[in-house]
């Protein structure tokens, strides 16, 4: 029993040491990448998209948590849910929880359209610069770096959007089956 405990502690210490070396290596390599102009453009594109997609990331994330709570029959505060729809109280006071969830999801569409519109504009500018229509030798690499930085955040937004729409479809199916 004692040898088991000692071996477990040795493995935990070894794992912590490996994690430390991995994270310091990632940190150093990240610093080296940012020293290049393309890496800096990637970082700026990543941070800019993160700021712009903040409402979508937290909105879809909160929606997914609330929808999963509804599907597992956990208690959901109707007043808090009505606040998240950004609708007047008079309009939401007689609505069911699935209807409030649908309103909440529909309220995120404006931000989604704006975000995907800006991302598409970044894609067009990047492609124009890479096809040498804007001068690929001067600014093409910077636009490409910013685009790929924004693409990382867009992947998360897209994944959360798909998950939220899937959960809303499951809620609609459950409500229609239960009548």
UniProtKB/Swiss-Prot annotation:
Domain of life: Bacteria
Residues spanning the membrane: 9-31, 41-63, 114-136, 146-168
Record's subcellular location: Cell membrane
GO cellular component, one term: plasma membrane
UniProt topology in membrane: Multi-pass membrane protein
Keyword Protease part of the UniProt annotation: no
Keywords in alphabetical order: Cell membrane, Membrane, Transmembrane, Transmembrane helix
Designated name of the protein: Uncharacterized protein aq_757
Lineage, top ranks: Bacteria, Pseudomonadati, Aquificota, Aquificia, Aquificales
């Amino acid at each position: 029993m004692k040898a088991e405990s000692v071996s477990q502690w040795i493995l935990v210490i070894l794992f912590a040491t490996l994690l430390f070396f991995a994270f310091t290596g990632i940190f150093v390599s990240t610093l080296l990448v940012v020293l290049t102009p393309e890496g800096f453009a990637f970082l700026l594109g990543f941070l800019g998209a993160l700021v712009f997609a903040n409402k979508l990331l937290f909105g879809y994330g909160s929606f997914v948590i609330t929808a999963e709570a509804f599907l597992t029959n956990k208690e959901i505060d109707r007043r808090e849910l009505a606040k998240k729809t950004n609708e007047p109280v008079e309009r939401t006071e007689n609505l069911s929880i699935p209807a409030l969830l649908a309103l909440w999801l529909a309220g995120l569409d404006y931000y989604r359209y704006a975000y995907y519109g800006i991302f598409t504009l970044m894609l067009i500018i990047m492609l124009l610069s890479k096809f040498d229509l804007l001068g690929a030798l001067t600014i093409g690499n910077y636009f490409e770096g910013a685009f790929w930085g924004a693409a990382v955040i867009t992947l998360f937004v897209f994944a959360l959007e798909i998950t939220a729409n899937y959960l809303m479809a499951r809620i609609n199916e459950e409500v229609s089956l239960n009548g």
